[in-house]
């Protein structure tokens, strides 16, 4: 049984952690979806800036092509770094975030994990663009 979202009280149960590694010095993204598209998916995007500062943000997509930053940032960066052209990000999220608008609840149901990456970090003040399908893929889990 999963924890409930009651009157704004959030679960204290976390997905232990997820680590992604990609041969890039740009941004890396994972999306949780019920379809093959990122439309209505729960998306996390991270990168390591030129100064070595790791960034991680919670996003969603209404149209399946562009991303919008969530009003509620529910992913927590554990560690992030670049090493010899590889970006490594480890993060976690509560199983139930109570963000019914944009976060996909983690349940026993099958969902699709969609990944993507870019060769460069997002420009300051700009959102990452999810359009390079040569650097994307997915799998049901």
Sequence positions of predicted segments:
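Extracellular-facing/secreted segment signature in eukaryotic proteins
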Residues: 1-141
């Amino acid at each position: 049984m999963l924890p409930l979202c009651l009157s704004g009280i959030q679960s204290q149960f976390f997905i232990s952690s997820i680590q992604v590694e990609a041969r890039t010095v740009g941004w890396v993204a994972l999306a949780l979806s019920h379809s093959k598209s990122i439309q209505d998916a729960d998306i996390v995007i991270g990168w390591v800036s030129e100064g070595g500062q790791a960034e991680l943000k919670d996003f969603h997509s209404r149209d399946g092509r562009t991303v919008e930053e969530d009003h509620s940032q529910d992913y927590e960066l554990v560690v992030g770094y670049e090493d010899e052209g590889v970006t490594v990000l480890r993060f976690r999220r509560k199983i139930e975030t109570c963000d019914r608008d944009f976060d996909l609840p983690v349940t026993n149901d099958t969902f699709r994990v969609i990944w993507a990456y870019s060769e460069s970090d997002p420009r300051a003040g700009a959102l990452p663009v999810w359009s390079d399908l040569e650097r994307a893929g997915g799998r049901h889990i």
